[in-house]
Amino acid sequence: MSNLVFDIEADGLTPTKIHCIVAMDVDTKDVFTFDNTQLDEGYNMLQTATKLIGHNIIGYDIPVVERLGHIDLSDKKIVDTLVLSRLFKPTREGNHGLEGWGYRLGFKKGDYGEQEQAWEHYTPEMLEYCKRDVVLNHKVYNALKHESKGFTPT
């Protein structure tokens, strides 16, 4: 069992298909990519994980994967770095999104998706963008773990 940082790319905010899945093992730093022909392997990896980590995975990625992949991830420990970012510093300079974190950590998110209709069909560039998001999110996860050392709920 493993702890995975993961991300998906799909065809919009109310998706009808997932284009790709990328996951990183938190301990080994191994990165696993699954394009649109390998999604079942990606679903299997997510199902075998102990903990799933990602940015807005509670609000987007997990519900989309469960609905379109026909899998159940409800038994997983979930760490949503967007939720933690807002919890630890509600008035964080910049914003809580991955793009803002990328600027703060000196690891820019990338600009894929700014072109019109970028999310309609799978492209290899989309997979690379997803991979970069996962690497950035791993950095965010580590930064938030460091921040949490001084966090005391009131």
Language-model features, listed with the residues they occupy:
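Conserved RNase H-like, two-metal-ion catalytic cores of nucleic-acid enzymes
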Residues: M1-R92
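Short helix-capping/linker segments at secondary-structure and domain boundaries
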Residues: K29, P90-G94, L144-G150
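A short, charged helix-loop
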Residues: G100-E125
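Short alpha-helix plus adjacent loop in nuclease-associated cores
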Residues: I78-R104, M126, C130
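Mixed-charge, glycine-rich, non-catalytic linkers/tails in nucleic-acid processing enzymes
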Residues: E116, E120-T154
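Short, flexible active-site-proximal loops enriched in glycine and acidic residues
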Residues: L73-K76, K109-D111, T152
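Generic, well-ordered alpha-helical scaffold segments in large soluble proteins
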Residues: V64, L68, W101-R104, V140-E147
